[in-house]
Every structure is written in structure tokens, then in C-alpha cells.
Amino acid sequence: MPMRRVPLPPDRDPGDLVDEAVAALRAGRVLVLPSETVYGFAVDPRNPAAVEQVRRMTGRAPGTALTLHLADRDALDAMVPPPPRRVRRLLERYWPGPLTAVLPGADGGGVRLRVPAHDFTRAVIRAAGTGIHLVHAAPADRGLLCGAEDFAAVFADAIDLLVDAGPPPLAQLSTVVRLVPAGPTVPGPRTAPTSAEFGELELLRVGTLSAQDVWAAAARRILFVCTGNTCRSPLAAALARRATARLLGTSDERVLAHGLSFESAGVAAFPGEPASRGSLAAAAEVGIALDEHRSAALDREQIEGAARVFCLGPSHLAAARALAPQRAADIELLDPGGAGIPDPFGGALDDYRRTRAAIERALDRRLDEIFAAIAAG
């Protein structure tokens, strides 16, 4: 039977076309549907013969896991056990959208899930009453097939229905991510957190979204505040990141992948200033580079986006609480004893060393609080 290629009507209800696509899926026919990333072969996962046919057409081995596309984020709960909170934050940010999540299923295996950001295809999924597989194709001699023209040129003889919604907006595959469970890896006085909230978000495929996009969207932000954001607060953020990295058995750079973003700002900062010479030197003595730090002025948005805000002195505490009084309970002095961390600005290297030591003592207590609060929700 010749391919039926149907343009998606921009100015009328596509309900009849939705019904036709659903009927074709249930009959085990070969469809191509659009998404915001690339077009793909659509198949009903309850039809094993149709699923294997699409695997063969796309060069996938028998039994290869395919991504289940859902109509809405709410459908997730029926597919897998509740994921960790940080994964939910990620899905709330990027679903519908170009993110595929590999989540633990009820049987312990991984389930690949996505909610595409294409109204027509989501309407088809919703009307079908179940998720569908939407499978991209990348023939060896053609590379990735992005749009309707590509599929028509290569698979016209094998396609029953192709819904043409024009070129896909992104023309790039989704990013695929999975959560690797955390576990104690480094012996020491503090026990490494084993909650799934601290597992590493591993990118199995980098597509439209970068690693930074994914990690930042899922992370809890911990904000340190001083005056100019050139001495104490950047040093505190860097020391907290280093202590967390050692605890989790990872590098400073990959702490973000484990769900924590340590940031800093100043209540009277001039944006774009480098770290002070003293802080650069004090950090370098413990193997931390602050060369790329640039100061940022504290604002309400930073506070509202942070899980906790730690101020280096009483004046910073007052200023931060005045900016966001509704978050006052989450804004505290870094020193649990209520003392401010001494300001070394303009002093000798020994002054910066004393400040570094005071920050380390305060962090030794505060990090346990942070880990416990995140694990408890």
C-alpha cells in the first residue's frame, strides 16, 4: 500500500487525524509522527510484532529497550515507583521537552520515558490510552533522519501513514539521563550520604540539553553571602564543594552532577570582579583554584532559588533577610555558634588562612545539616 502523507492542518481541529493515527497504531501499522526533536516511527508497545518490525527497520537488535513516550507528566506515576525529588524537579523543568529519563521500574530494571513537546503527538498518545514508542532512525548511509522529508525519502515503501507537521523545531535528539545510586565511597569521620538524592545524574546521550542544563535544573542550590563576593563567600563555596566531593568520592567539578550547587554572592558586590589575592592564595594552598571566580551582587531571585543561604557575618544576614523576608528561616549565619567569619580583606595571607580555618570549622557542622535536610526532604 502506498504511503499516505498527511499535512497537519494548522487552522482546524486535527481530531479526525488523531483518530486515524490511533486506529493505525492499534492495527499494528507503521506510522511516522512528529516531535519537537526529530520525527520517529510510532508503534503501540502492546503489539510485539509491530515493535520488532520497527527495531528491524531502524537497525536495532531484538529486545533493545525503546523509549516510552507519555502524553503528560502525570502519567509517570503509573509507570514507575516514585523517583527521587531531584529527578522530579528535573522532569518538572523539561517535560514536556527534549529529555529522556531512564528510571528504575517496579522490577528493578530501567524504563526509558519521555513526554514530547508536540501537541499533536501528545494528543495521539492521550487518545491511545497508553504510552507509545516513538523511535528515531539513523541509517548508516544517511545519518539522523530529522523531518518528514527525510523519512519519506528513505522509508516511503515501508510507511503506512506519515503526519507532516513541518520541520522539527530542534532537529536534534533528546538528552538521555539516568540516576546512578550513591553509596559510601570514602572512609573518614563523616559517613557518606546514601540517599538517592545524592546519586550522580549520568548522561547516556547528550542531545539538545547539555550536562550543565540537566545538572543545574536538578540541583539544590546552597548560597554563601558576604560583602563584596571576592574574599569570604567564594572561598566558602569552594571549600564546601571540595568537602562534598571528597565525601562522595568525586571531583569538585562533578559535585553538581550529584545534586548540589554551591554558589556565592555579595550584598555590596561590583559584578565581575575576580577573587582577592589573599583568597586566591589561601585556596591554592589547599589545592583549590578560584581563578575563574567573578563576583555577583546578591538579589532576591538568588535567595528564592536557594535551598539554604549562609551569611558570613551579621550585616549580611540582615541584608539577605531584608531582601527576602519570606525566606528568613532559610537564611542563617554560616557559623552555627552565631559568630561572624572574620573579614580578611586587605590583610596578610595569615589573615586569609585564619578565615579559611574558621569557614572549615563552620562547614564541618553545616554540611551534616545540609545532607540530612536534603535526604529527609
Regions found by a protein language model. Name each.
Residues M1-L223:
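Active-site-adjacent structural elements in enzyme catalytic cores
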Residues R4, G131, L161, S261, ...:
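Conserved beta-strand segments of alpha/beta enzyme cores
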Residues V6, L113, V176, L290, ...:
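Short clusters of hydrophobic/aromatic residues that line enzyme substrate/ligand-binding pockets
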Residues T58, T244-L248, A320-A324:
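Conserved hydrophobic residues forming the short capping helix/wall of the S-adenosyl-L-methionine
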Residues L70, C311-L312:
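Short beta-strand scaffold positions
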Residues A219-A306, I370-A376:
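Conserved active-site segments centered on acidic
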